[in-house]
Amino acid sequence: MSQQDNVKAAAEGVANLHLDEATGEMVSKSELKKRIKQRQVEAKKAAKKAAAQPKPASKKKTDLFADLDPSQYFETRSRQIQELRKTHEPNPYPHKFHVSISNPEFLAKYAHLKKGETLPEEKVSIAGRIHAKRESGSKLKFYVLHGDGVEVQLMSQLQDYCDPDSYEKDHDLLKRGDIVGVEGYVGRTQPKKGGEGEVSVFVSRVQLLTPCLHMLPADHFGFKDQETRYRKRYLDLIMNKDARNRFITRSEIIRYIRRFLDQRKFIEVETPMMNVIAGGATAKPFITHHNDLDMDMYMRIAPELFLKQLVVGGLDRVYEIGRQFRNEGIDMTHNPEFTTCEFYQAYADVYDLMDMTELMFSEMVKEITGSYIIKYHPDPADPAKELELNFSRPWKRINMIEELEKVFNVKFPSGDQLHTAETGEFLKKILVDNKLECPPPLTNARMLDKLVGELEDTCINPTFIFGHPQMMSPLAKYSRDQPGLCERFEVFVATKEICNAYTELNDPFDQRARFEEQARQKDQGDDEAQLVDETFCNALEYGLPPTGGWGCGIDRLAMFLTDSNTIREVLLFPTLKPDVLREEVKKEEEN
């Protein structure tokens, strides 16, 4: 081809090219179409990808309370509530909230609801304390409400709320521990991850009834420190369901005993708690002073002498459930202030009371726990140690003196010689030979009581120990079979005494002589011995019918039925040293 033809061909080729505006290149028409089409496809992909990108996360609301320590929390919350007290928007302490159904009744009534089922027309209003609060976005909030010993879930959605504009404000005000009132409809939730869902209140309105100014202990760590639990029992009850259940069981014990006696035509009475003479038991009393009468008085150690005076007066069956006060040591099973039940029945004796005791306690255990057999862990230092206590009838019965002779392999003096000085030397020798220590004064009664402790340690299942010496029982009637002994029994469970009963001494001459013997022991230094009660002796002179008397410790019963190894667990407010005094003692010990 000539040079002229080449130039012509090149010119025609250029004339057929088109500008690619994206790159500035000159390309053929087909190439340009190809490129444009490719770019359109890529543009669509980019647009689709951009549409799929998540929206920028909205900033979460700042929780002013989230990172505060307990002291800062209290100060901040107090300021918040103080402001509401001024503005009443809302009033943080309203006078009334109408509750239409209790929390346990609510759960029971709607337990039949199926997963995801709701009843928009079924309106309820309930109340309780917030134990948990969580959010799922800004339009859905969950609460766990505690009340009457159960948990109820609250589910609050913006769409259900009575005033959408106040939704955030109302919920932001509520904190863990607050007491709230809730209105809404009923339903069962439908969790995405499976499960049956929770019977819940779908909230239409929530109202703060009482704010909690303090930070509650975290659920994860709990509220476990014993000393703090006893000092702040209110917080213990808020945080620990077991604590609440223990005191419900204690109430059931008292209710059962009261019903048992009421059904048998006993009359419940009340007798004085302050007395001129501390009588009715062998114990050291508290002394108080009556300003108007300008005289010292004793807090009662037992109601026995008053109750027997009522039987003299013709009230043949009487009982009293109440507090007693003994100025003695504090340990795992003793508190200076404690609760007993005592009853007295005319024309009954110690053997009738044995049968009543077996019946009362065995059926009480069955009714409250569902079985005659309960598990008990006596040693806090050894949680694995477990006792099986069988309350079914009949119970084992041990004759005190006969069993002591077996245990110590000696022959005891006859019952009518147990009070003599010779017997005192005999008892001292047994104590020395067996390396047993009895705190002074070494009266025969105290030394015998120490020896009987060796029998008590063998009593695991409920056991009667009977046949006590008269000198150990100044208010019990003498044995009709064995001189020097009396008609008395004690019941021991897991080595602890829970019950004491006897045929009552109704001979005024014998009673006065016994009181005088007690006075002699008091002169020997026994602070627990009784004084002569002339008022009671005078009442006996009018005639006390043959009578059986019975007493039991409510606190120890509660310990066994709640599996508590310390009496403090079953006393709402046990006796404790004040915090300030406790700190002083601690510093002295450290120094």
UniProtKB/Swiss-Prot annotation:
One of its GO terms (biological process) is lysyl-tRNA aminoacylation. Residues 28-45 have a biased composition (Basic and acidic residues). Keywords: Acetylation, Aminoacyl-tRNA synthetase, ATP-binding, Cytoplasm, Isopeptide bond, Ligase, Nucleotide-binding, Phosphoprotein, Protein biosynthesis, Ubl conjugation. It is an enzyme of class 6 (ligase). Its main location: cytoplasm. Belongs to the class-II aminoacyl-tRNA synthetase family. CDD domains: LysRS_core (cd00775), LysRS_N (cd04322). It comes from the Eukaryota. The keyword Nucleotide-binding applies. NCBIfam families: lysS_bact, PRK00484.1. The gene is KRS1. The modification N-acetylserine is found at S2. It is found in: Cytoplasm. There is a cross-link at K308, K577 (Glycyl lysine isopeptide (Lys-Gly) (interchain with G-Cter in ubiquitin)). The modification Phosphoserine is found at S30. The modification Phosphothreonine is found at T62. This is Lysine--tRNA ligase, cytoplasmic. Its EC number is 6.1.1.6. Homodimer. Residues 1-64 are annotated as: Disordered. GO terms for cellular component: cytoplasm. Pfam families: tRNA-synt_2 (PF00152), tRNA_anti-codon (PF01336). It comes from Saccharomyces cerevisiae (strain ATCC 204508 / S288c). GO terms for molecular function: ATP binding; lysine-tRNA ligase activity; mRNA binding; sequence-specific mRNA binding; tRNA binding.
